[in-house]
Design a protein with these regions (language model features):
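Residues that flank catalytic or metal-binding motifs in active/ligand-binding sites
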Residues: 50-52, 67-70, 124, 170, ...
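Extended active-site neighborhood of metal-dependent phosphoesterases/phosphodiesterases
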Residues: 2-120, 223-229
Length: 278
């Protein structure tokens, strides 16, 4: 956060098990984040579980007032004793039903607003970010594209089916962290077979910080950060309606595992041969 302030870059944050497990109350933490220079953090509705369930809209170049993307950020809570018969340790709280209801009502209200403003046929994409992965990230049938699985998915054993709400709302991708040496983007088979209007893509960010582990089972992985690029046609060489992602790897300049998630305003599925580990 300090680095982004020095560079005068707007930033935002979501709550994770790393903050939820601390003594400082979430509300107080959010107040601190809001006071930082260039911070876009918001506390979110008081009647929704967790702190920091909110959305940000990205608009086209001025003088346009048309939103080209909506970014949703959700609190993924903290660690809990296992709630299933499976000996699962650690286990984590799932996304709560109040959060799913908030996401659905908000996304549909924003959709209706775009329709009322005559923007229904214009490019718009939605991306969700949360720290702890959904249970779907652990599906053994995932079709991976760009990147690899370096460790098992560590997420909630209880599935509250937030993924189904993402499908219904037409979300292009969900990005998460938590599992430091996973860095893939993937689709469930039923979404892959759609060829188009698939999604959401399930994308890991990889290990970014130097204060965290970056190895598993004795194997070291390069630290990396996932970059998301949204094309809105502001530049002559920029494609409108395209969303790309890749990882920037420690000590390397080239893009790794670059993939087009959305092309011509359509979430892509079955896009070709999967990428190997990079």
């Amino acid at each position: 956060m300090k680095g982004s302030g020095r560079c005068r870059v707007s930033d935002t944050s979501m709550f994770t098990n790393l903050r939820a497990d601390k003594e400082l109350a979430g509300k107080t933490q959010m107040e601190i984040l809001q006071d930082l220079p260039y911070s876009l953090c918001q506390p979110g509705p008081a009647n929704v579980d967790g702190v920091g369930n909110y959305y940000l809209q990205i608009f086209g170049a001025a003088p346009s007032t048309r939103p080209v993307a909506t970014i949703y950020l959700l609190d993924s809570h903290g660690q809990i004793p296992s709630t299933t018969n499976v000996n699962r340790n650690p286990d984590y709280e799932p996304i709560k039903h109040s959060q799913i209801a908030w996401f659905w009502s908000t996304s549909q209200a924003l959709r209706r607003e775009r329709e009322d403003n005559g923007d229904a046929d214009s490019f718009h994409t939605s991306i969700v970010f949360q720290h702890i992965p959904l249970p779907e990230f652990d599906d053994p049938k995932l079709i991976m594209h760009a990147g690899c699985r370096g460790e098992p998915t560590e997420g909630p054993s209880q599935n509250t089916y937030f993924y189904d709400a993402l499908v219904g709302a037409g979300v292009a991708a969900i990005g998460c962290g938590h599992d430091h040496v996973n860095n893939f983007c993937a689709l469930l088979p039923e979404q892959w077979r759609k060829k188009e209007k698939a999604g959401p893509w399930l994308c890991y960010g990889g290990c970014f910080g130097f204060g965290a582990y970056c190895e598993y089972d004795g194997k070291r992985y390069w630290r990396r950060a996932r970059v998301w690029e949204l094309g809105v046609g502001m530049k002559d060489d920029e494609e409108e309606g395209v969303v790309r992602t890749w990882t920037r790897v420690e000590y390397q300049k080239e893009r790794k595992g670059e993939i087009v998630l959305v092309n011509n305003d359509t979430v892509q599925g079955g896009a070709g041969d999967s990428y190997g580990s990079k």
